[in-house]
């Protein structure tokens, strides 16, 4: 989930640093997110959610309940990993954590949802809220090549950070968080100050040219979401992850590629490289 806010130097995105001991991409800076749980499907109903029809239409290639569950999962994972709850009250406004008592209550809810003792549906029912699925704009669809028996089929969404909520890492799966512009994140990665997985790098490259959150959202709403399935090859003993648009990948990309269309795994991290034959 890309959570954006307007900053002095352009849109800033909220990123978290994965725990070093995480089996996959430990220590990397990523966007909050996770997987779909059974409870997400249980909450995927009109009485709990706004934007049900649009959510189903966004991912029309899936059964509607699965498409809606993807959106619910994005909301839940954002709450668990960043403490941001995309839900509205009866007045139509996003829930506010400005009041200390409310903030403490929802902070405990966040822990309980993470621990499995509480569901997102429990919270919205208790508080009289509705999950704001209509606040999520589909951004990308990535399917990673199988590596060490792991393969990920991931949907990226983008949203504007709600007022009166301050995201922060969970201090469990993630150990650090930061608001940062796409350009700054890329520069820090180039300087080996942070690690960015290839899909994260590519996403940041796509949004770094925009001056406001409104511009990012408008562009995202108009783009065609296609399945991105990088190819993993080995050249001269080096692992390469090739994106559509690279000379070694036959298919044409839906969007014009960035100058980097491949990533080389060097010294324990993926490094973006310009296309070459």
Predicted regions and their residues:
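N-terminal leader/linker segments that precede catalytic domains of diphosphate-processing enzymes
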Residues: 1-277
């Amino acid at each position: 989930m890309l959570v954006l806010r307007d900053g002095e130097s352009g849109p800033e995105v909220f990123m978290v640093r994965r725990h070093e001991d995480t089996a996959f991409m430990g220590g990397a800076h990523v966007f909050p997110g996770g997987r779909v749980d059974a409870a997400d499907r249980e909450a995927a109903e009109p009485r709990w959610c706004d934007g049900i029809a649009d959510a189903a239409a966004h991912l029309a290639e899936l059964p509607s309940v699965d498409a809606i569950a993807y959106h619910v999962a994005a909301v839940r994972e954002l709450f668990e990993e960043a403490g941001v709850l995309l839900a509205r009250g009866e007045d139509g406004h996003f829930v506010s954590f400005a009041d200390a008592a409310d903030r403490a209550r929802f902070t405990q809810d966040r822990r309980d949802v993470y621990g499995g003792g509480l569901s997102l549906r429990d919270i919205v029912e208790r508080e009289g809220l509705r999950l704001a699925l209509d606040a999520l704009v589909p951004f990308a669809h990535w399917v990673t090549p199988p590596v060490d028996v792991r393969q990920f089929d991931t949907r990226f969404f983008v949203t504007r950070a709600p007022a009166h909520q301050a995201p922060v890492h969970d201090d469990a799966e993630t150990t650090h968080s930061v608001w940062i512009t796409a350009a700054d994140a890329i520069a820090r990665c180039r300087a080996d100050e942070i690690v960015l997985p290839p899909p994260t790098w590519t996403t940041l490259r796509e949004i770094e040219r925009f001056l406001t959150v409104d511009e990012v959202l408008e562009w995202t709403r108009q783009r065609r979401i296609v399945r991105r399935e990088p190819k993993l090859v080995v050249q001269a003993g080096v692992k390469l992850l090739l994106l559509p648009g690279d000379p070694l990948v036959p298919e044409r990309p839906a969007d014009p590629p960035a100058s980097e269309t491949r990533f080389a795994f060097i010294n324990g991290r993926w490094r973006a490289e310009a296309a070459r034959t």
